[in-house]
Amino acid sequence: ISQSTGHTLQTEALAPGSEAPKGAITLGLDPAIGNREGYVLTVKADRVTLNGQTENGVFYGIQTLRKSIPAETKATSILLPAGSIQDEPRFSYRGMHLDVGRHFFPIEFVKKYIDLLALHNMNTFHWHLTEDQGWRIEIKKYPKLTEIGAWRDRTVIGRNTEEYDNTRYGGFYTQEQAKEIVKYAEERYITVIPEVDLPGHMLAALAAYPEMGCTGGPYEVCPRWGVFEDVLCIGNEKSMQFLEDVMAEIIDIFPSKYIHIGGDEAPRTRWKKCPKCQARIRTEKLKADKNHTAEDR
């Protein structure tokens, strides 16, 4: 509210059963509200009352109150229409996705993005951290992921025009910065779900550690867009260990219930010709069909 009005509101706790002074905005918890993220916002001539079943609900009600105030009003007094809003989410999962793999965004932009999610009562931030075009999260056991994988030498101009800007581009987040984002989101009742896309979309990782690909490379951090045949070698024990190690560090950074692992656009071209992959397929009796993935259909 202070962002919209320029006024910093004083806050104080009310004793149970006491009445707030006239002109106050009163926040409270009401277990009778049916949805844990629901709230009731009531505007009367002399006061505003906002109750939620949980702190989450109160927070979402505050966002509605914020949006009732004219943007950047900086007014000394604000008129709100009298009435009551009883609101609750239709969907328990409400999120948006940010791809920082293809295009890197600095941490301050990520925070602003989270602020906008909060303003619109979103509760999940899907953070797409790895791509063919860049690896964006520090993994301490594999430093080349950010030393090499976070940077591409050039970027295609437009939609795969075969013209390039010949400008080095990239960036990454340290683990401390990622934890800072998790905390920032948590303070706004938003869960961060990280995505490490695999086994496809891994050219940035293969550029850093070419031994994890079926051909052994050389690979480059991809400067263009599309779906590419070089994916993680599933028959290589180093690849399996890599995945375990990376996920162990990701889990330590992100306390979310879910970790997204992509799974899209992974051509099996290399696997079909790779002796190691074919050996694993036979040993573990792995099977698929032509309708196994959208890319095969």
Kindly label every feature range from the protein language model.
Residues L198, G217, F228, L243-R270:
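Active-site groove signature of glycoside hydrolases
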Residues R94-L98, F125-W127, A185, V192-V196, ...:
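Hydrophobic faces of well-ordered beta-strands that scaffold small-molecule active sites
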Residues I1-Y93:
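Contiguous, structured surface segment used for ligand recognition
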Residues G101, T130-G134, D197-H201, D264-R268:
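Active-site beta-loop-alpha junctions enriched in small/polar residues
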Residues I1, T54, M96, L117, ...:
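Conserved, mostly hydrophobic/aromatic
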